[in-house]
């Protein structure tokens, strides 16, 4: 009917506009007319949409591409547009090749309606619009909507679409239970459903499913099992997990087991696979291994008695005794008594009616009794809204206490539990030590958040090995949902949500699991599966091996957003890691009174740094002027396509809306930190970034200079480097001559220090400088004084001995002269008295006496000379020994003093280097603080940042980046300073060894001088 078309396309326009458009298309246009379906072709439908909602935004884009010069695009222009705008630059060029003329011609052939333009290889604005609105230009890679992931990894390596309290259609209190919910949830791709099982109280005592003690209606367990059988593998062939919350007696547990066995048949996985035995350390089977299999998640037997029963049951079953389970029930009197004691009532208000007061049943039962008269009345009231008053409901909620599942398990039910065995969580370290992959634990959202807060990395590692299930906390009586993203970030497999509530959390869940063929299983990223990788879900820095992304979304326009003349605006949010999540920050302006084709033309909303694109999702939501949701779409970032895209919207329940779309320009690229853009551009396109020399060579060629005419010359830098190396070479070291008292060298002691880079600023230590020091000069002066004093003493002793010897010689000579003169005078007197002739005999005698006297004199002189020579030589030797001894002592003192002075100089050098390092570190910290302040100031003054949250995020990101960079700089500086200190100590050690070696050489030379003096020693005297 035309009336239906009018309602669909009106969008605030008058009916006359629609009628006129239909008339122009040659279709019936009367209000009561009807259009033949065969006449209303897709082409007519497309033309009708274009007449009602003209695409001026695409016209503007078309003119921008061709420069508004023609009414068409050439192949080259189309190829350029496709490669520059419609292609993600991060994609591999081999797997995702660039568009070429051939591909552009295929697009023209497919979407250009004008045959003449097709033949010319041109595309009109109409053909361009058809292409942009086609499935080929979908906002996501279409293959991601098919089954594209590997399904051979262990179950723990997948996110699993999971439901909580699947049977409820609404609230947790006074809600209605429905078998149909299981069908719808499974058809939607959910792979884990929950069954709260209670004892039925009818004559047949059939197990029921209900929300115990919450005044919810009941459904039969067997009906649910039948519904699961019918729909479990319609949407997906991968395994379904039934999460049993068991409150039943053992008898009804047995009935549950038989229903599962009889209705599911071979679909039920009753035994572990031979390839994956239930042993510690053995990984779980893969979804492919468990295709078309149903697993039961339930605690196994707890007590020793139950374990013995289970072993006996298995033995009987292997022997083919089918009646064993029933017989076991009959014999199990003790367990029946215990079961009766622990039995819980699903509806205590049914049993007691109005007989019990609040004291008997508690406040919640009393309120229930005041509202309900019998079970029939209760069920009737449950089917309507407003089950109880607000006050009654609040009282129920305040007094409600969750009743845990029984641990008294029938052995027959235990035989059906294998790869999903819940255990009480005792800690991550305990789970790691046990290493049992088929054990799993459930956490309510609050407990899960607590573990994430304190043990985030351990939680991620736990989820690499075994499964975990998160479910809403008990306070969510309105069946609202928590945000699942935080638990996906930590690798939790079963993030269970209330499917009956189409809130934001469910939209994220359904948008995420729409990928991979809606099979209900999504493979976790590599770093969340590999045991050798560590991942912190709260990290604010890029993950090793994962390339961060930048995503910008420009909301251009909307089409057919509402059938009313209302105002609309668009919000764009990002969900992912905490640092990637940006909500309620980016929204367009409100376009008033236009629900048909509002044009927003906003500046791009830029998500600068998405650390983990694999976990991030983009949410685009349209609201009216009353902030009511019109439509939304969840787009996982890892499958998002760049370019100008039409995004078809979904309702709050994620059901596709027929016409509403948002036209956006999406830009995806690799995240590049500020300041590194030029480097990345140079790496991605080196030809555009030639070196300076290459540019100069090109300029020379442009002037007619041939490349062969340009000689290769060495750079000044290399010459300077060689010169510097030559200057820093160590000079030859030569010892002093032996005639000097102390050793020295012609080269500076610090020559070796110059060769060490990084410590050039420290003054050199030279021997000459040490010898010019006041302490050394003072000590040298003292030594010279001691030596001079000794020499004076020796000179005095020389003089004394010389005088003594001279006196002794003079005395002997005088005595000789006297005796000789006496003999001569006696002879002379005799000759005078007797005459010369008479004294001949006497003369001979006198001559003989004189000869004898002379002979004696010579003998005495010889003796005295020998004695003097010995005394003089002994004295000289003694003096020489004393002088040599004191010279040795003085040399030793001098060497030791030089050594001490050098050590002292080294200590000063070390202290000076430490001060230099402290000053350098202080300057670096000051410089870093200055940079941080300047960067923060630049962000605060950046007018391109539109809101406070983005500014704070940029500051936080900057602080994180600066902290990492500054710590790295300080680490490098500390390493450099440590290296310089080591170099200095090494050089100082070399210098000390050099000085000690010189001292030893000086001592050896001194010994050689002493030895030469001893060897040259001869008898001597002074005459």
Swiss-Prot record:
GO CC field: plasma membrane
Predominant place of localization: membrane
EC number: 3.1.4.11
Compositionally biased region (Polar residues): 729-742, 933-942
Subcellular location(s) of the protein: Cell membrane
CDD domains with a match to the protein in the record: C2_PLC_like, EFh_PI-PLCbeta4, PI-PLCc_beta
Modifications made to the protein after synthesis: The N-terminus is blocked.
Gene Ontology terms: biological process: lipid catabolic process; phosphatidylinositol metabolic process; phosphatidylinositol-mediated signaling; phospholipase C-activating endothelin receptor signaling pathway; release of sequestered calcium ion into cytosol
Reaction it catalyzes: a 1,2-diacyl-sn-glycero-3-phospho-(1D-myo-inositol-4,5-bisphosphate) + H2O = 1D-myo-inositol 1,4,5-trisphosphate + a 1,2-diacyl-sn-glycerol + H(+); a 1,2-diacyl-sn-glycero-3-phospho-(1D-myo-inositol) + H2O = 1D-myo-inositol 1-phosphate + a 1,2-diacyl-sn-glycerol + H(+)
Modified residues (Phosphothreonine): 734
The PI-PLC Y-box domain, residue ranges: 413-529
Listed transmembrane segments: none
Catalytic-site annotation from UniProt: 164, 211
InterPro entries on file: C2_dom, C2_domain_sf, EF-hand-dom_pair, PI-PLC_fam, PLC-beta, PLC-beta_C_sf, PLC-like_Pdiesterase_TIM-brl, PLCB1-4-like_EFh
PROSITE patterns membership: C2, PIPLC_X_DOMAIN, PIPLC_Y_DOMAIN
Function summary: Activated phosphatidylinositol-specific phospholipase C enzymes catalyze the production of the second messenger molecules diacylglycerol (DAG) and inositol 1,4,5-trisphosphate (IP3) involved in G-protein coupled receptor signaling pathways. PLCB4 is a direct effector of the endothelin receptor signaling pathway that plays an essential role in lower jaw and middle ear structures development.
Cross-referenced PANTHER family: 1-PHOSPHATIDYLINOSITOL 4,5-BISPHOSPHATE PHOSPHODIESTERASE BETA-4, PHOSPHOINOSITIDE-SPECIFIC PHOSPHOLIPASE C FAMILY PROTEIN
Protein name (record): 1-phosphatidylinositol 4,5-bisphosphate phosphodiesterase beta-4
């Amino acid at each position: 009917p035309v009336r239906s078309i009018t309602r669909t396309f009106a969008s605030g326009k008058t009916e006359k506009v629609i009628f006129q458009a239909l008339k122009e298309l040659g279709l019936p246009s009367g209000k009561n007319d009807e259009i033949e379906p065969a006449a209303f072709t897709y082409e007519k439908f497309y033309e009708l949409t274009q007449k009602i909602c003209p695409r001026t935004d695409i016209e503007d884009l078309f003119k921008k591409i061709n420069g508004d010069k023609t009414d068409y695009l050439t192949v080259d222009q189309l190829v350029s547009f496709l490669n520059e705008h419609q292609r993600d630059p991060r994609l591999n060029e081999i797997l995702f090749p660039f568009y070429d003329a051939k591909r552009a011609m295929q697009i023209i052939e497919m979407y250009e309606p004008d045959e003449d333009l097709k033949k010319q290889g041109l595309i009109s604005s109409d053909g361009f619009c058809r292409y942009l609105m086609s499935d080929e230009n979908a906002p996501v890679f279409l293959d991601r909507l098919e089954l594209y992931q590997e399904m051979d990894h262990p179950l723990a390596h997948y996110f699993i679409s999971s439901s909580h309290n699947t049977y409820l259609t609404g609230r947790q209190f006074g809600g209605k239970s429905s078998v149909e919910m299981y069908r719808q949830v499974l058809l939607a791709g959910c792979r884990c459903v929950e069954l709260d099982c209670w004892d039925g109280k009818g004559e047949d005592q059939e197990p029921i499913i209900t929300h115990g003690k919450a005044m919810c209606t009941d459904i039969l367990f067997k009906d649910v099992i039948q519904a699961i059988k019918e729909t479990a593998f319609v949407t997906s062939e991968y395994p379904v997990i039934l999460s049993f919350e068991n409150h039943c007696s053992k008898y009804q547990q047995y009935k549950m087991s038989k229903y599962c066995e009889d209705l599911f048949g071979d679909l039920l996985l009753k035994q572990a696979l031979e390839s994956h035995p239930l042993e510690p350390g053995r990984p779980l089977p893969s979804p492919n291994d468990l295709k078309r299999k149903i697993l039961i998640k339930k605690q196994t037997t707890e007590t020793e008695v139950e374990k013995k029963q289970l072993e006996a049951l298995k033995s009987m079953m292997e022997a083919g005794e089918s009646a064993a389970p029933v017989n076991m029930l009959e014999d199990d009197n003790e367990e029946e008594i215990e079961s009766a004691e622990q039995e819980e009532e699903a509806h205590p208000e049914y049993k007691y009616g109005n007989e019990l007061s609040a004291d008997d049943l508690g406040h919640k039962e009393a309120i229930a009794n005041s509202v309900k008269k019998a079970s029939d009345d209760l069920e009737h009231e449950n089917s309507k809204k407003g089950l109880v008053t607000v006050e009654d409901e609040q009282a129920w909620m305040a007094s409600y206490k969750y009743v845990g599942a029984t641990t008294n398990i029938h052995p027959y039910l235990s035989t059906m539990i294998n790869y999903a065995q819940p255990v009480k969580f005792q800690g991550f370290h305990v789970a790691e030590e046990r290493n049992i992959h088929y054990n799993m634990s459930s956490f309510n959202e609050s407990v899960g958040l607590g573990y994430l807060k304190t043990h985030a990395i351990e939680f991620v590692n736990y989820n690499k090995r075994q499964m975990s299930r998160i479910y809403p906390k008990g306070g969510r009586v309105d069946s609202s949902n928590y945000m699942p993203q935080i638990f996906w970030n930590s690798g939790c497999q079963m993030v269970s949500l209330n499917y009956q509530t189409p809130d934001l959390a469910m939209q994220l869940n359904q948008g995420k699991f729409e990928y991979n063929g809606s099979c209900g299983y999504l493979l976790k990223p590599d770093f969340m599966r590999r045991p050798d990788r560590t991942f912190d879900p709260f990290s604010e820095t890029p993950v090793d091996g994962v390339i961060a992304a930048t995503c910008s979304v420009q909301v251009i326009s909307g089409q057919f957003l509402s059938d009313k003349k209302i105002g609309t605006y668009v919000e764009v949010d990002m969900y992912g890691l905490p640092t990637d999540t940006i909500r309620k920050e980016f929204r367009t302006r409100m376009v008033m009174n236009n629900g048909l084709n509002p044009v927003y033309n906003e500046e791009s909303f830029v998500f600068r740094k998405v650390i983990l694109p694999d976990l991030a999702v983009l949410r685009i939501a349209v609201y009216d002027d009353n902030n009511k949701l019109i439509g939304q779409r969840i787009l996982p970032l890892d499958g998002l396509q760049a370019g100008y895209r039409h995004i078809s919207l979904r309702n709050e329940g994620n059901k596709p809306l027929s016409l509403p779309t948002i036209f956006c320009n999406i830009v995806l690229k690799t995240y590049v930190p500020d300041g590194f853009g030029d480097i990345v551009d140079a790496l991605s396109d080196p030809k555009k970034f030639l070196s300076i020399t290459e540019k100069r060579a090109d300029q020379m060629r442009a002037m007619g200079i041939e490349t062969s005419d340009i000689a290769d010359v060495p750079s000044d830098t290399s010459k300077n480097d060689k010169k510097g190396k030559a200057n820093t070479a160590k000079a030859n070291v030569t010892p002093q001559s032996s005639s000097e008292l102390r050793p020295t060298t012609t080269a500076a002691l610090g020559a070796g220090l110059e060769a060490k880079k990084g410590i050039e600023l420290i003054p050199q230590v030279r021997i000459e400088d040490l010898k010019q020091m006041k302490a050394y000069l003072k000590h040298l002066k003292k030594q010279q004084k001691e030596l001079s004093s000794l020499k004076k003493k020796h000179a005095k002793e020389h003089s004394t001995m010389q005088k003594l010897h001279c006196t002794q010689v003079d005395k002997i000579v005088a005595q000789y002269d006297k005796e000789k003169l006496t003999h001569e005078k006696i002879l002379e007197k005799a000759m005078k008295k007797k005459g010369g002739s008479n004294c001949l005999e006497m003369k001979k005698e006198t001559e003989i006496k004189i000869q004898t006297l002379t002979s004696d004199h010579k003998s005495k002189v010889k003796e005295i000379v020998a004695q003097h020579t010995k005394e003089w030589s002994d004295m000289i030797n003694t003096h020489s020994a004393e002088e040599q001894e004191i010279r040795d002592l003085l040399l030793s003192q001098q060497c030791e003093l030089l050594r001490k002075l050098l050590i002292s100089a080294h200590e000063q050098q070390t202290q000076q280097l430490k001060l230099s390092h402290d000053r350098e570190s202080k300057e670096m910290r000051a410089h870093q603080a200055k940079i941080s302040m300047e960067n923060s100031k630049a962000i605060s003054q950046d007018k391109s940042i539109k809101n406070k949250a983005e500014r704070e995020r940029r500051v936080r990101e900057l602080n994180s980046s600066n902290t990492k960079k500054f710590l790295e700089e300080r680490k490098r500086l500390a390493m450099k300073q440590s290296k310089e200190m080591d170099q200095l100590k090494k050089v100082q050690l070399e210098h000390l060894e050099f000085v000690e070696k010189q001292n030893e050489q000086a001592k050896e030379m001194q010994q050689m001088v002493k030895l030469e003096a001893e060897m040259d020693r001869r008898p001597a005297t002074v005459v």
